[in-house]
A protein has these predicted regions:
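Phosphate/adenylate-binding glycine loop and adjacent helical scaffold
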Residues: 95
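Basic, amphipathic N-terminal segments that precede the first structured/catalytic domain
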Residues: 1-82
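Catalytic cores of nucleic-acid endonucleases
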Residues: 116-153
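Short, flexible/disordered intra-domain loops and linkers
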Residues: 112-121, 160-163
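Short secondary-structure capping micro-motifs at structural edges
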Residues: 68-78, 83-92, 115-120, 133, ...
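Electrostatic, structured charged patches in enzyme active sites and in nucleic-acid/phosphate-binding
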Residues: 59, 63, 71-74, 141-145, ...
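Conserved catalytic cores of phosphodiester-cleaving nucleases, focusing on short active-site segments
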Residues: 87-89, 99-111
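Short, low-complexity, polybasic intrinsically disordered segments
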Residues: 154-200
Length: 200
């Protein structure tokens, strides 16, 4: 998987990790840095406050790779690019039967901002996930029939928000149409190389 990604995507940063608690933060809103991976909730150096994250519970300390995309990384050609999510995550010794998780994050300050109609964050985030997964399949990074997981995350929202974004029918339709198991959540649990649970 890593080799196939490297062959198709030049602008990306890979973070190997085996933390039992994996915290993924998009630093663009806080500093000039991009996405980073931490073993604990990080602190904003400008304010001293904790920064909320996407958290992956990894009790077995399994080795995984978090592959973060630089802006405009998914290029079909010089003139055509795919919209992209923040990162893709997968087991270090990936096999095609293993799970793959795509993550898109928005640091909306509160629920009102997250779901304000004119911002249209949920639909934009879902489209970024769809186009990223399609790029991976178009470039043969993933098989066309591969089922994948996806998280639409609002790290600053501490209460459950999946049902605000997706009805049960919408989740089922998304899976049937695109082969993507998607949830609105900030949390997941890595069970094994072929099993991951989206919490929310």
């Amino acid at each position: 998987m890593k080799t196939r990604i490297n062959d198709s995507i030049q602008q990306h940063q890979v973070y190997p990790c085996s933390y039992t608690s994996i915290h993924i933060v998009d630093w663009k809103k806080f500093t000039s840095e991009n996405l980073k991976v931490h073993d604990r909730v990080p602190v904003n150096p400008n304010t001293g406050k904790l920064i909320h994250s996407v958290c992956l519970r990894n009790d077995s300390a399994m080795s995984i790779l978090v592959d973060a995309f630089v802006e405009n990384a998914l290029q079909y050609s010089k003139k055509k690019k795919a919209r992209q999510c923040e990162c893709v995550i997968y087991p270090d010794n990936y096999k095609d039967t293993d799970w793959v998780l795509f993550v898109e994050m928005k640091y909306a300050e509160n629920e009102i901002a997250a779901f304000r109609k004119e911002n249209d964050y949920p639909n934009n985030m879902i489209e970024q996930i769809k186009q990223t997964v399609q790029f991976f399949k178009d470039k043969c990074i993933l098989p066309q029939e591969k089922e994948v997981y996806a998280i639409v995350s609002f790290p600053n929202l501490l209460s459950a928000f999946n049902s605000t974004i997706f009805s049960i029918d919408a989740i089922n339709d998304f899976y049937l149409d695109y082969g993507i198991i998607i949830r609105g959540t900030n949390n997941a649990e890595i069970i094994s190389s072929d099993n991951i649970k989206l919490i929310g």
